């Protein structure tokens, strides 16, 4: 298939649960990519974790051959994208390799904030966006209202949007027909020198680095010598091929196609995502515009439970970073937890997923500290520094001004839940920026402190709106705020891993809530354990985990009171001595208590 006019590269944009992976399954089934017995739900969500949570985390690609009604067989390269707000980076990578995108919208629920954000990304990248209404078989489906919403909220013409039901397979052939006519063919020249963009790469223990690429110009085949532009290293191609959805080797990959290249690269960072590949004979090919490096929003410390695992942990992180380039990490050490890494994530879901992948795929036991965001500090000597770890905060006397990151949040919510959402935003110290009424939905824009958003905002937004509100946010600016560092002291000793940076107005409340929570989680010892929350030198809250005590008077039947007093005094002295030398083991749950403060 050397003719580019028969190739269509597209991806699907959709909100979580709008039926993206199911539609992909139907495409694979209709184009005969898998035998009946191999067909299973969510073929592309290959990670166990993706299946359990029912979300797509990684971008995947599939090449299908579809015989259209005009008798021509088209090669469809379909790149699956995640729908969750934490994985926008994966989406922008997938879109960079396509000429078009299907915007899949649930005909019952209507447009959600996340699809709006991803759709704008697609339009900015110059893609042809084709609306598809899914779940048309549901009783609550209302295609006319949803078409109107698409036009009002996103601003693309949806009057003749295709309707289908991915679950029953109704109308899916119509989607494929429309796709072939609407989405433009790729441009590129097979005769030009090779120029290919790495969309994704992952590490295979046997094959080395496997890279998913989109070839812009030229061709690449087994035995070619390829040059990685960013590292300048040359590798020999072992095999090229496509996923349909199984690994299938082909003779070559040509301009306009999407497939994989295996070149025996053993260095984990040998083929970074967003990089350009070319042949070693034409090293001066232009670098393709990659994707913008995305900045992590949330930081947390990850520590192996046993210090022997530290090296394995480092290696696991390196392999994960290859596959998920939005993860960043630097080594750190903590008095309470030993050596570990400070990792940067895109959001809380991303953090949970990474931790779970480390524990499952690499068999590690990890302790996570409470997540924090980056604060900007203006010091009295005129310096500006950025702090992502409360225990690294300089002395308050040296700080002129503390600024916290503010995010601009777009929330789409049905009118009947608007009041609850506004109350939640005000409680989270939000400032309303804008409000638009779009049919039965309302789009509210708030400026919220990121510190309040990362912990539990998403969950609480869903629960106050019965799951109907959807959220999309991006970093906006740093703004001065009255922030303080809240330390937790256990038996008079500061535990660095439990420190928090909070707003002064909430400090007393947070301190009280945190000490109460810790009291439930720290097991009782043989001596009293005092848990205190302090701001600077001032203690704002205290609770005590009461000691377990043996009844030393049990053996005195009657007898003299002085005998009893002697035994009690002796016990008291023992407890006092124990308290001076005793250590308190802090369980993992206690470190995460910070997350579960019902603010």
Curated annotation (Swiss-Prot):
GO-annotated molecular function: GTP binding; GTPase activity; guanosine tetraphosphate binding; ribosome binding; translation elongation factor activity
GO cellular component terms attached to this protein's record: plasma membrane
InterPro entries: EF-4, EFG_III/V, EFG_V-like, EFTu-like_2, LepA_C_sf, LepA_CTD, LepA_IV, P-loop_NTPase
Class of the enzyme per the UniProt entry, highest EC level: hydrolase
Keywords: Cell inner membrane, Cell membrane, GTP-binding, Hydrolase, Membrane, Nucleotide-binding, Protein biosynthesis
Gene3D superfamilies named in the record: 3.30.70.240, Elongation factor 4, C-terminal domain (3.30.70.2570), Elongation Factor G (Translational Gtpase), domain 3 (3.30.70.870), P-loop containing nucleotide triphosphate hydrolases (3.40.50.300), Translation factors (2.40.30.10)
Record field: catalytic activity: GTP + H2O = GDP + phosphate + H(+)
One biological process term in Gene Ontology: positive regulation of translation
Protein name from the UniProt record: Elongation factor 4
Organism this protein belongs to: Pseudomonas fluorescens (strain ATCC BAA-477 / NRRL B-23932 / Pf-5)
Lineage start: Bacteria, Pseudomonadati, Pseudomonadota, Gammaproteobacteria, Pseudomonadales
Gene name tied to this protein: lepA
């Amino acid at each position: 298939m050397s003719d580019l006019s028969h190739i269509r590269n597209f991806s699907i944009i959709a909100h979580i649960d709008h039926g993206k992976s199911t539609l992909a399954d139907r495409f694979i089934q209709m184009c005969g990519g898998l035998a009946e017995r191999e067909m299973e739900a969510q073929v592309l969500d290959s990670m166990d974790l993706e299946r359990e949570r029912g979300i797509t985390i990684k971008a995947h690609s599939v090449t299908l051959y579809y015989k259209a009604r005009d008798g021509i067989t088209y090669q469809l390269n379909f790149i699956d994208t995640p729908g969750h707000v934490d994985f926008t980076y994966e989406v922008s990578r997938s879109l960079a390799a396509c000429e078009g995108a299907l915007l899949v919208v649930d005909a019952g629920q209507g447009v959600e904030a996340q699809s709006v954000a991803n759709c704008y990304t697609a339009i900015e990248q110059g893609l042809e966006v084709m609306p598809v209404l899914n779940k048309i078989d549901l009783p609550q489906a209302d295609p006319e209202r949803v078409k109107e919403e698409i036009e009002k909220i996103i601003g693309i013409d949806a009057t003749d949007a295709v309707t289908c039901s991915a679950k029953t397979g109704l109308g899916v052939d119509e989607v494929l027909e429309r796709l072939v006519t609407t989405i433009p063919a790729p441009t590129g020249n097979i005769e030009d020198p090779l120029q290919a963009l790495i969309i994704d790469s992952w590490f295979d223990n046997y094959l080395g680095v496997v890279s998913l690429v989109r070839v812009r110009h030229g061709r690449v085949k087994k035995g070619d010598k390829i040059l990685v532009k960013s590292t300048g290293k040359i590798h020999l191609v072992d095999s090229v091929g496509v996923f349909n959805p199984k690994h299938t080797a082909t003779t070559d990959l040509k301009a306009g196609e999407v497939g994989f290249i295996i070149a025996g690269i053993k260095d984990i960072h040998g083929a970074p995502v967003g990089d350009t590949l070319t042949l070693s004979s034409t090293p001066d090919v232009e670098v393709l515009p990659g994707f913008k490096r995305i900045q992590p929003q949330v930081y947390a410390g990850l520590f192996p439970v046993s210090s022997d695992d530290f090296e394995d942990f480092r290696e696991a992180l390196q392999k994960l970073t290859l596959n998920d380039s939005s993860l960043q990490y630097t080594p750190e050490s903590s008095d309470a937890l030993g050596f570990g890494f400070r990792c940067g994530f895109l959001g809380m879901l991303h953090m949970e997923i990474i931790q779970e992948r480390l524990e499952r795929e690499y068999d590690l036991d990890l302790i996570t500290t409470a997540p924090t965001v980056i604060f900007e500090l203006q010091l009295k000597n005129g310096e500006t520094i950025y702090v992502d770890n409360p225990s690294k905060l300089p002395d308050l006397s040296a700080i002129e001004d503390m600024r916290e990151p503010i995010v601009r949040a777009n929330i789409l919510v049905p009118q009947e839940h608007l009041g609850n959402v506004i109350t939640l935003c005000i409680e989270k110290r939000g400032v309303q920026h804008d409000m638009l009424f779009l049919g039965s939905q309302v789009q509210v824009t708030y400026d919220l402190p990121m510190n309040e958003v990362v912990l539990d905002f998403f969950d609480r937004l869903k629960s106050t709106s019965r799951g109907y509100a959807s959220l999309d946010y991006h970093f906006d600016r740093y703004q001065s705020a009255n922030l303080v560092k809240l330390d937790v002291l256990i038996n008079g000793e500061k535990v660095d891993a439990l420190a928090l940076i909070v707003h002064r107005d909430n400090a007393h409340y947070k301190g009280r809530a945190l000490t109460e929570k810790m009291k439930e989680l720290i097991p009782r010892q043989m001596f009293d354990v005092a848990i205190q929350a302090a701001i600077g030198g001032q203690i704002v809250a205290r609770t005590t985990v009461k000691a377990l005590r043996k009844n030393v008077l049990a053996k005195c039947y009657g007898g003299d009171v002085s005998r009893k007093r002697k035994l009690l005094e002796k016990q008291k002295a023992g407890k006092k001595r124990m308290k001076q030398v005793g250590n308190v083991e802090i369980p993992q749950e206690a470190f995460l208590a910070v997350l579960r403060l019902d603010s």
